[in-house]
Amino acid sequence: MLNVNEYFEGQVKSIGFEAQGDRTSVGVMAAGEYTFGTAAPERMTVVKGSMDVKRPGHVEWETFNAGDDFEVPGDSSFEVKITSSTAYLCDYL
């Protein structure tokens, strides 16, 4: 079953689903700055575009481009800066 989610007044939209027992979501973020909370560990992969990310425990912002991925621990939060619409894939670990 597909779960459609909308965050930040419609600036971030995602579709969540299960594939072979794994929870995943795909989505698009419009330009802006966002803070996301995590319940479970996540692996984010940039599909198209780029994002600047400040992960928990990191002082510096990191830039991730299409094809790059990064992990975020569960029960934490991370900040994202988007300069132009960016597509992503999120795997819940």
Swiss-Prot record:
It catalyses: a purine D-ribonucleoside + phosphate = a purine nucleobase + alpha-D-ribose 1-phosphate; adenosine + phosphate = alpha-D-ribose 1-phosphate + adenine; cytidine + phosphate = cytosine + alpha-D-ribose 1-phosphate; guanosine + phosphate = alpha-D-ribose 1-phosphate + guanine. Keywords: Glycosyltransferase, Transferase. InterPro entries: Ppnp, RmlC-like_jellyroll, RmlC_Cupin_sf. Its EC number is 2.4.2.1, 2.4.2.2. It comes from the Bacteria. One of its GO terms (cellular component) is cytosol. It is an enzyme of class 2 (transferase). The keyword Iron does not apply. Gene3D superfamilies: Jelly Rolls (2.60.120.10). GO terms for molecular function: guanosine phosphorylase activity; purine-nucleoside phosphorylase activity; thymidine phosphorylase activity; uridine phosphorylase activity. The keyword Glycosyltransferase applies. Catalyzes the phosphorolysis of diverse nucleosides, yielding D-ribose 1-phosphate and the respective free bases. Can use uridine, adenosine, guanosine, cytidine, thymidine, inosine and xanthosine as substrates. Also catalyzes the reverse reactions. Belongs to the nucleoside phosphorylase PpnP family. This is Pyrimidine/purine nucleoside phosphorylase. The gene is ppnP.
